[in-house]
């Protein structure tokens, strides 16, 4: 039995990640495809993260970074097991978000990556570009929904993309929604059909 693919959607806030994940789940109906999003706010760490994001509690930046990281590690075994059982996972945000947001707040990218080192490695990361309209919409109730901060996050994402150690697919914000939906579907189908070898380890 071939293993499943780990396919991650990344991008700035309000770039359409969840929408595109749901499009995939609807357009490729299968009992071998599951959706997972981060942070998972139902766990102990997830509830602490939710309190922070909704401004109910404050933590220093180092604690915040570790909380997000721990939240992903809580699901590392689950992800590994699902992939080995032939289940493809469509993941809304992953370690790259954690590193980009932490680095945008001044943390060392190298240190932030070390916390995530060893997580299951994605077979594909789809990065959704944000147009000026989407970026300017990044003003909201949650703590990171700030235009200036989101621009800093974008620069950190670009650094990771340029490293070339992960298979990134960048989706332009200029595509019409129906074109974007079809393009992403085809990219995901190809990734599922071409996945080979054991699950890798991220940043090892």
UniProtKB/Swiss-Prot annotation:
Please give the catalytic activity noted in the UniProt record. Answer: dTMP + ATP = dTDP + ADP
Question: Which InterPro entries is this protein grouped with?
Answer: P-loop_NTPase (IPR027417), Thymidylate_kin-like_dom (IPR039430), Thymidylate_kin_CS (IPR018095), Thymidylate_kinase (IPR018094)
Q: Name one Pfam family in it.
A: Thymidylate_kin
UniProt pathway: Pyrimidine metabolism; dTTP biosynthesis
Keyword ATP-binding among record annotations = yes
The UniProt entry's GO biological process terms, in alphabetical order, are: dTDP biosynthetic process; dTTP biosynthetic process; dUDP biosynthetic process
Task: Provide this UniProt record's keywords sorted from A to Z.
Answer: ATP-binding, Kinase, Nucleotide biosynthesis, Nucleotide-binding, Transferase
- Determine if Translocase is one of this entry's keywords: no
- Note the SS bond partners: none
Any one Gene Ontology MF annotation carried by this entry is: ATP binding
- Domain of life assignment: Viruses
- UniProt-listed Enzyme Commission number(s): 2.7.4.9
Q: In which residues is ATP bound?
A: 11-18
Q: Which family does it belong to?
A: Belongs to the thymidylate kinase family.
Protein name (record): Thymidylate kinase
Which gene holds the coding sequence for this protein?
A: TMK
């Amino acid at each position: 039995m071939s293993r499943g693919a780990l396919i991650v959607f990344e991008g700035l806030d309000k770039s359409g990640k969840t929408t595109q994940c749901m499009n995939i789940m609807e357009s490729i109906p299968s009992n071998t495809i599951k959706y997972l999003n981060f942070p998972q706010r139902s766990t102990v760490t997830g509830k602490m993260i939710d309190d922070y994001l909704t401004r109910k509690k404050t933590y220093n930046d180092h604690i915040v970074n570790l909380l997000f990281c721990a939240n992903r590690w809580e699901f590392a075994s689950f992800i590994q097991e699902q992939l080995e059982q032939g289940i493809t996972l469509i993941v809304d945000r992953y370690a790259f978000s954690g590193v980009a947001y932490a680095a945008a707040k001044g943390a060392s990218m190298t240190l932030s990556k070390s916390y995530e080192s060893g997580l299951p490695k994605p077979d594909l990361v789809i990065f959704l570009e944000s147009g000026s309209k989407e970026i300017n919409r990044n003003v909201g109730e949650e703590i990171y929904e700030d235009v200036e901060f989101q621009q800093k996050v974008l620069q950190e994402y670009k650094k990771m993309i340029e490293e070339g150690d992960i298979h990134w697919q960048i989706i332009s914000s200029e595509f019409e929604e129906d074109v974007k939906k079809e393009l992403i579907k085809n990219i995901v189908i190809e990734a599922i059909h071409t996945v080979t070898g054991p699950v890798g380890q991220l940043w090892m």
